[in-house]
């Protein structure tokens, strides 16, 4: 991902304020509510029958935290996202058979959640930088797909 110095600073400054537990669970939960077909990958998570059930599901929250932890790792390796996410790309492609479009959807949901949490602080410049980052991460996660 090519980010200007200003964009990198904007991304890292905001990310330093992100509560990974809270934002991760909310982002994954919203993905599952807004795009219900994505729930098929999480059937072992128990009750996903209503938006409230999804948003309060401890397994959704825990996995969201894990997902955002990996995203955090990617932010420290913006110049090598494909290498950083190679193992996760392989896992999601070969073992889990996740449609790579879901990575793009989750990235866009994450941007919405960040905007919700940070309000005026999430300026158009910050949003543009995050859109580049989530697109780069989605591309890296889709890399092993044939």
Swiss-Prot record:
Heme b binds at residues 63, 92. The modification Phosphothreonine is found at residue 12. The modification S-nitrosocysteine is found at residue 93. The keyword Zinc does not apply. InterPro entries: Globin, Globin-like_sf, Globin/Proto, Hemoglobin_b, Hemoglobin_oxygen_transport. Keywords: Acetylation, Heme, Iron, Metal-binding, Oxygen transport, Phosphoprotein, S-nitrosylation, Transport. Pfam families: Globin. Coiled coil: none annotated. Signal peptide: none annotated. The modification N-acetylvaline is found at residue 1. Red blood cells. Residues 2-146 form the Globin domain. GO terms for molecular function: haptoglobin binding; heme binding; hemoglobin alpha binding; metal ion binding; organic acid binding; oxygen binding; oxygen carrier activity; peroxidase activity. Involved in oxygen transport from the lung to the various peripheral tissues. This is Hemoglobin subunit beta. It comes from Mico argentatus. The gene is HBB.
């Amino acid at each position: 991902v090519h980010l200007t110095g200003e964009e990198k600073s904007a991304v890292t400054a905001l990310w330093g304020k992100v509560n990974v537990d809270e934002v991760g669970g909310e982002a994954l939960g919203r993905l599952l509510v807004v795009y219900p077909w994505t729930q098929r990958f999480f059937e072992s998570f128990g009750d996903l029958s209503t938006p409230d059930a999804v948003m309060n599901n401890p397994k959704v929250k825990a996995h969201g935290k894990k997902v955002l932890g990996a995203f955090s790792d990617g932010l420290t390796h913006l110049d090598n996202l494909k290498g950083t996410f190679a193992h996760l790309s392989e896992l999601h492609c070969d073992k889990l058979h996740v449609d790579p479009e879901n990575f793009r959807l989750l990235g866009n949901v994450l941007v919405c959640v960040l905007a919700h949490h940070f309000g005026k602080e999430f300026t158009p410049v910050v949003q543009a930088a995050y859109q580049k980052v989530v697109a780069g991460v989605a591309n890296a996660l889709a890399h092993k797909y044939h």
